[in-house]
C-alpha cells in the first residue's frame, strides 16, 4: 500500500503558541519566553476575538425592563426609575382588576414592548435632568411628548398620567404668560370629559377659556387656543344640559345653554353659534316656552341661511315644525316640514326624509285628510325599503297600514249604509281581492284603483309581500 506524505498545514500564530505549550512538546521553554508568549496571546485575543463587557453580559441575562431600570439607576435618574416602576405596578393592578371581573385582558405588559420602554427612558430622564436645572418648560415638553406618544385607546391611562404631570409642572412655568398652563387645563378638561365627569371638565375648560381670552396663542395646527376653548366649553355645556333635560331640570338646562350661546358668540364662529342656538331652542321647547323657542330657532335658521348650510337649515325647519305642532299651528308646521322634505331629498338624507314624511303623515291623519296622510306614509315606507332598515320598514309599514285603513273607512261606511245590491257586491269583491277601492257617491258604484300605490316595485316580491295590505 502506498503511503502519502503528511499534509503541510498553515497554522495561526495563536495555534502555534498553543501547540508549543502542549505536554507532548519536547522543548523546554524559558520563563521569559513564556511571559512574552502570554502577552502575544492576550494581544491576539484582544485584536481578533472581541469579548463581552459586563454590561453586555447583563443585557443578555436580564429582561429589557430590568436593563432599562438598571440604566436609569446607574445614570442617577432615581425619580425616573420610581415613576416607571409605579406605572408598571399600576398596569399589574389593572390586569388583576380585569381578571377579577372575568374580563379577557388583551393589553400587553409594558415590559414586553421595548419601543415604549425606550420612550420612557428617553423622555423621563430628559425631564428629570431639566427639572434639576429648573428648566420647567423643557420638563413640560418632555412629559407632553410622552402623553402624545401614549394617546391611543390601549394606553389612554398612561396618557392621562402624563396629562396630570404636565398640569402640575405647568403651574411652575412663568416665562410664557400662561400658555402652557392653558394647554394643561385643556388636557385635564379632555381627560375628565372622556371619563364622563362633566362638572370637573367644565371647571378646567372654564379656566382654559379664561387664560386664553385676549390672547393670539395657536396650537401646533395653527388653530387659535381661544377658539378651541370656546368649542370645548360649548360642547361640555351641551352635554351637561342633556343630563339636566333628562332629569326635567329645564331651568338649569336653559341657563347653562344661554352661557354656551354667549361663549359661542365670543368665539366668532357662526357655525358654533348656530349650533348653540339650536340646542337652546330645543330646551325651550321641552320646557313649554314655545314663543321663545321659535325666536331662538329662527335665529338658527338665519345663521344657517347666511352660511348656505342646507342641512342645518333643514334641522331648523324640523325643530320649528315641532314647536308649531305643539302650539296647534298645523298649517304652519306643514309648510316647514314640506321644506324639510325637499332639503332632505336634495341632500340624499334618507333618514331625514323618513322622519319628515312620518311627521307630515301624522299631522294629516289627525286632520282627517287620509289621502294625504296615506301618501306621506307611503313615501316614508318606500324610503325605508330603499335603505333596507328592518326596524324603520316595520314602523313605517304600520303607519302606512293605519292610514290606508282610515282612507278606506269612509268608503266602506258608505257601502254599508247604502244597503243595496251594488254596494254588497262591491264589499264582497273587496273581501276577495283586498285591492284599493274608491266609492263614487253620485254613480253609486265602485271603481277599483287601476294600480295600487304599494305595488310600485314589481320586481321586489319580498317588499310587496311585506306591505301593510298583504299582512
From Swiss-Prot:
It is found in: Cytoplasm, Cytoskeleton, Flagellum axoneme. One of its GO terms (biological process) is cilium movement. The keyword Manganese does not apply. Keywords: Cell projection, Cilium, Cytoplasm, Cytoskeleton, Flagellum, Repeat, TPR repeat. PROSITE patterns: TPR (PS50005), TPR_REGION (PS50293). TPR repeats lie at residues 92-131, 136-173, 182-215, 234-267, 274-307, 314-347, 354-387. Transmembrane segments: none annotated. GO terms for cellular component: cytoplasm; cytoskeleton; sperm flagellum. Axonemal protein which is implicated in axonemal and/or peri-axonemal structure assembly and regulates flagellum assembly and beating and therefore sperm motility. The TPR repeats are required for axonemal localization and flagellar beating. This is Tetratricopeptide repeat protein 29. It comes from Rattus norvegicus. The gene is Ttc29.
